[in-house]
Amino acid sequence: MAQGSGSAERALVLGVVLVFLVFNCEVAESVVYTVGDGGGWTFGTSGWPAGKTFRAGDVLVFKYNPAVHNVVSVPAGGYKSCTASPGSRVFKSGDDRITLSRGTNYFICSVPGHCQGGLKIAVTAA
């Protein structure tokens, strides 16, 4: 009987530990952000990331008229010069979902004059 009692105690301790873990573990969930909020991806959104905390795995949704704009993921140099290099990923659906990588993620509109007019954002994800 003593042996059965030890098994019950171990099961109880294991149950308590599992309950503790369930209630004290932090679950990392990605957050979905719509770039530009209600206005979408358009001129004047370059300051949109300010004050927000982004994490790797969060998703940016770019909503825009695909007949007018696009979204291009570029490196820092392309962001500064408003140039999409060959091999840059171009999105043009008007409802694009892009998952953030750790570090700074740069996006521009490659329609002539749009990036130069301020249609670009830099988003840093921890």
UniProtKB/Swiss-Prot annotation:
Strongly expressed in stigma and style and to a lesser extent in leaves, ovary and petals. Not detected in pollen tubes, mature anthers or roots. One of its GO terms (molecular function) is electron transfer activity. This is Chemocyanin. GO terms for cellular component: plasma membrane. Diffusible chemotropic factor that induces pollen tube chemotropism. Induction: Activity enhanced in the presence of stigma/stylar Cys-rich adhesin (SCA). The lineage of its organism: Eukaryota, Viridiplantae, Streptophyta, Embryophyta, Tracheophyta. Residues 31-126 form the Phytocyanin domain.
